[in-house]
Amino acid sequence: MAGWFSSTSTIEDQVEKATASSLEDIALNLEISDLIRSKGVQPKDAMRCLKRRLENKNPNIQLATLKLTDTCVKNGGTHFLAEIASREFMDNLVSLLKTEGAPLNSDVKAKMLELIQDWAMAAQGRMDLSYVGETYRRLQDEGFRFPPKTQISGSMLESSAPPEWIDSDVCMRCRTPFSFMNRKHHCRNCGSVFDAQCSSKSLPLPHLGILQPVRVDDGCYAKLTSKALAPSGLSDRASFKNNSITKSSVMEPRGGRAEGGFDDDLRRALQMSLEEAQNKGSSGYVPQSTAVQQPPRAPAQPAIEEEEDADLKAAIEASLRDMEEHKQKHAAALKNTSSADIPSRQTPSATPLPKNSYELSPVEVENIHLFAALVDRLQHQPPGTILREPQIQELYESIGALRPKLARSYGETMSKHDTLLDLHAKLSTVVRYYDRMLEERLSSAYAQHSLGYSPVPGGSPYPNIYPPMPAHAPDGKTGTESFYYGNAIAESHQAPTTPYPQPQPERELHERVGTRSGTMSPGVYAHPSQPISPTVPWNGSAHAVASPQPSSASMAYPSNPSAYAGPAAPTQFYTSPPHVEPDSKPAQHARPMEPDMPYQGSPVMQRETPYQPTAPSAPDLPADQGPASGYGLQRQPTDPSAALYYAPQPPQGTPYPAYPQGAPVHPGQAVGDVSPVGVTPAHAPYQQPTPSRPPVEESLIEL
């Protein structure tokens, strides 16, 4: 407690001394700020001391106090900034500005407004100092006239301060537990806790505002002392090549800042990259001087070392000049040799240069990566570190010159990317078309392969005017018998699902026969006694296709009706010219216009017609039913009277099982019905024959 009171009295005395004169004592102000930053005095006590000094009625004292406060704000550390940005201090300034009894001096008021504006501009984006900005905006709203704004960086308020102390039960270096005999000691540089053996060194810490020697641990002591001796201990070419330049260009912080945030290796790499960028990537032999090989002198002779450094500088400069001259001569000789010996290669070698002019060199790429690494390191360092490292600024300028080249390289890369995307889309389209073609070929191959195992419908090369008939009938009866004798066929028969137009000749045939159907004699079948030669069967071959030519009226009847009883495996139907007796003239006279009717024999595949006919067997067929088959196959009319016209009901019969019928009619086939009374297409409804009923009854009576 005694130490606190003594420190408070010390800060009060120093503040009073610094603000007693009308002239600003910069040295004393910096000493006070270092005392606050080193935490030699409590920041709240320092703030209250400055606040009491501002309440003095003397304007000169008020102005000096304001200047001292500004110096302490910029160098006192974050812990003091928090006290200045508190309501206690800022509200006191506002109350001084709004004093009504004794008006504030104009100079003091202007200085106070200027400082509030500067602090608010520098504290932007910091939540712990947000009240300064609120006060500034409130004064603006109340109509206070502030001076013109000046751009102030936030790093103005940044200053290094001793870290907060860290507590632990063991030494953070040797891990020895603390006890009554082994006491704790905090390092003033890093804030960690160590025992007496690991923190026996003492050093002043001017970068933290601590000017007297304080306790530090062995690690911080080695780090701080090695950084002070690092330029003389480096042995690489960067150290002895640019030793004097580095010493003069590096901006060391006040008092020799030790915690720069960069390691020696990183500094060395930064210097080497800058040198390589300046030399444009050229390399050459660097002869080492003899002075480097000499052992270092004792540090007790500074004058001799300075003389040796001067000699070393002269030797290095001479070697550098020789190296540059050697490189220039070598480059000129290489250029002349390449131009004289290989003239033909100049054009091909010069061609890629414009193409690769936008590409980054390895040195430039390395500089970009190094700059990115340095910027990442700066994220974990105090904001003022970037101002103390001129190498970062130089590297930023060198990288900024690469923006056009980098933009062009990026544009070229994007154009290549777009081209590759277009090519990929085209390849995808080609692959899709190729897959579709393979699928079509595969499906066609499967279709051709399945033709040998299942009846696949196909276009017939010949026109067909006959209706579909079943290939086989149960019990040895063919589809032809069922056509003539089954009266259930007309009810169960289904028309083709897809109608197709009939060829023109069939339509003409239909018109011709249809016009004659009304004049046909009812006694066409009135001569059942005419003998018919049974020598030639109607089904001659399994796969033969015949197209009989039009013949006379005597060839209008089929050969042998008994041939229908045999098993008819093939599905073709055609007529053969029958052998008619010479005395068959009544039949010829009954059909006078028959030679005009054309015959078209074509194979018909019979499928898809389930039926159960009740027709009798083929041997029971009367002889007068044979001539009806000579005109072609015809669907049974749905009228029962019309069905009696073609065939009477048999006395006995066995019902046939349903027989499937496949292969629908295709466009290549011409399906039609040819009957003694007319020809009807497959897709048109059946027209009943036009002969009157009485002739039919007379013919049945005659039978």
Curated annotation (Swiss-Prot):
Q: Where's the UIM domain? A: 261-280, 307-326
**Which residues belong to the signal peptide in this entry?**
none
Skewed-composition ranges (Pro residues): 648-658
Report biased composition (Low complexity) as residue ranges: 291-303
Region ranges (Disordered): 276-306, 323-357, 568-703
Keywords in UniProt for this one? Endosome, Membrane, Metal-binding, Repeat, Zinc, Zinc-finger
**Where are the zinc-finger regions (FYVE-type) in this chain?**
165-225
GO cellular component terms listed in the entry, alphabetical order: endosome membrane; ESCRT-0 complex
* SUPFAM superfamilies from the UniProt entry: ENTH/VHS domain (SSF48464), FYVE/PHD zinc finger (SSF57903)
| Domains (record comment) | The FYVE domain is involved in the binding to phosphatidylinositol 3-phosphate (PtdIns(3)P) which is required for the association to endosomal membranes.
By sequence similarity, the record places it as follows: Belongs to the VPS27 family.
Function in brief: Component of the ESCRT-0 complex which is the sorting receptor for ubiquitinated cargo proteins at the multivesicular body (MVB) and recruits ESCRT-I to the MVB outer membrane.
Q: State the name under which the record lists this protein.
A: Vacuolar protein sorting-associated protein 27
Please give the organism.
Answer: Aspergillus niger (strain ATCC MYA-4892 / CBS 513.88 / FGSC A1513)
